[in-house]
Swiss-Prot record:
Entry superkingdom: Archaea
PANTHER family xref list: ASPARTATE CARBAMOYLTRANSFERASE REGULATORY CHAIN
Summary of subunit composition and partner proteins: Contains catalytic and regulatory chains.
Listed cofactors: Zn(2+)
Keywords: Metal-binding, Pyrimidine biosynthesis, Zinc
An annotated GO cellular component: aspartate carbamoyltransferase complex
Protein family according to the UniProt entry: Belongs to the PyrI family.
Pfam families given in the database record: PyrI (PF01948), PyrI_C (PF02748)
InterPro entries xrefs: Asp_carbamoyltransf_reg_N, Asp_carbamoylTrfase_reg, Asp_carbamoyltrfase_reg_C, Asp_carbatrfase_reg_C_sf, Asp_carbatrfase_reg_N_sf
Name of this chain's protein: Aspartate carbamoyltransferase regulatory chain
GO molecular function, one term: metal ion binding
Gene encoding the protein: pyrI
Length: 160
């Protein structure tokens, strides 16, 4: 947890929920959009705090919500350096270091209108990672490449 000095926490600990740490600076609000947080959740956002590894980072704490696998996969695409910590009774019971998978299925859409995934309801879109920095993924059906900007646009603009 980030500290103001060695004894004072910026944000208090949570009893149960999720802490998403090591989010690239400026991406915390995008993470919240992915999680579709409704009224009633207590949330703490810490943005642009110092990080030895990253220079600056964001942190998101959400009480009484555990991030599921689909949400974690979407977060990975916009915050590949993030770590998801599941908290129960003030203790970290699970820690997941996110990593962009080699293949992503069903989370992104191909931008090629002629791709079979845009014309056949049974064809599930799939993308193969071709680079991480910058993030680029290639459609496994038609070889169309989408970049990080397109991925962000799809994830943050999605209504699913």
């Amino acid at each position: 947890m980030e500290t103001v000095n060695k004894k004072e926490l910026i944000v208090s600990k949570i009893k149960n929920g999720t802490v998403i740490d090591h989010i690239p600076a400026g991406r915390a609000l995008a993470v919240l959009r992915i999680l579709k947080i409704a009224e009633g959740y207590r949330i703490a956002l810490v943005m642009n705090v110092e990080s030895k590894k990253m220079g600056k980072k964001d942190i998101v704490k959400i009480e009484n919500k555990e991030v599921d696998e689909k949400e974690a996969n979407l977060i990975t695409l916009i915050a590949p350096t993030a770590t998801i910590n599941i908290i129960r009774d003030y203790e970290v019971v699970e820690k997941k270091k996110l990593k962009i998978p080699d293949i992503v299925k069903g989370l992104l859409k191909c931008t090629n209108l002629m791709c079979i995934t845009n014309n056949d309801v049974e064809a599930i879109p799939g993308f193969k990672k071709i680079s991480e920095k910058p993030l680029k993924m290639k459609c496994v059906y038609c070889d169309t490449v989408i970049d990080e900007n397109e991925i962000l646009k799809q994830i943050l603009g999605s209504k699913s």
